[in-house]
A protein has these predicted regions:
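Conserved, charged catalytic cores of large soluble enzymes
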Residues: 1, 111-138, 157-172
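Secondary-structure transition/capping motifs at alpha-helix termini
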Residues: 2-4, 28-37
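Active-site cores that bind ATP or allylic diphosphates and position pyrophosphate for catalysis
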Residues: 1-14
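Secondary-structure capping and boundary motifs in well-ordered enzyme cores
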Residues: 13-16, 65-66, 95-106, 145-152, ...
Length: 173
């Protein structure tokens, strides 16, 4: 189907670079098809420090995680914890820790506070933090390094939580 080819990014694992960087382009050229614009090579996903293996039985079931935590939690964990171009380690303990610390506590607390503040009259938070503007600029410089982007987003969330703590609107009403 010519509507989906050429690929902008050809995503492959590091274990099959030779085939997809040498042979696949040759096949495409011989078929007079355009080459992908770039090749994105990701590392391996390990589990508790070990390479995933059916024999060892340490395969991750994404549906099990989605049923327990939701798809967005799994996406967030993978983007935050697994470096884009390097090997990354999956740990159920770390997933649970991130779910509770980042999503339930830090982000959940911020959303709750902002929702409550939004329901009050005459509460205005003037947040002019230079670091947040710098973090936005950094996002553009880290394309495809999702773990770095997420780290910068969390700096913004923490800065906003800190501003709300310092402003202490619950003491002013």
């Amino acid at each position: 189907d010519r509507s989906i080819w050429p690929a902008d990014i050809h995503v492959i694992g590091k274990g099959i670079i030779k085939f997809h960087a040498l042979y696949w382009p040759a096949f495409l050229l011989s078929a007079k098809l355009p080459l992908p614009k770039s090749i994105f090579v990701h590392g391996y996903l390990t589990v508790n420090g070990q390479k995933m293996s059916k024999t060892v039985g340490n395969i991750i079931d994404p549906f099990e995680i989605i049923n327990k935590y939701g798809a967005d939690t799994l996406r967030y964990y993978l983007l935050k914890e697994i470096p884009t171009f390097d090997d990354g380690n999956f740990s159920y303990d770390r997933l649970n820790e991130i779910y509770n610390a980042d999503l339930a506590n830090e982000l959940g607390n911020l959303v709750s506070r902002l929702t409550n503040l939004g329901q009050q009259d005459k509460i205005i938070i003037d947040h002019k933090d230079k670091d947040i503007k710098d973090n936005r600029r950094n996002h553009r410089q880290t394309i495809l390094q999702f773990n770095v982007i997420i780290e910068n987003v969390w700096k913004e969330i923490k800065a906003l939580n800190k501003s709300i703590d310092e402003f202490a609107p619950w003491k002013k009403t």
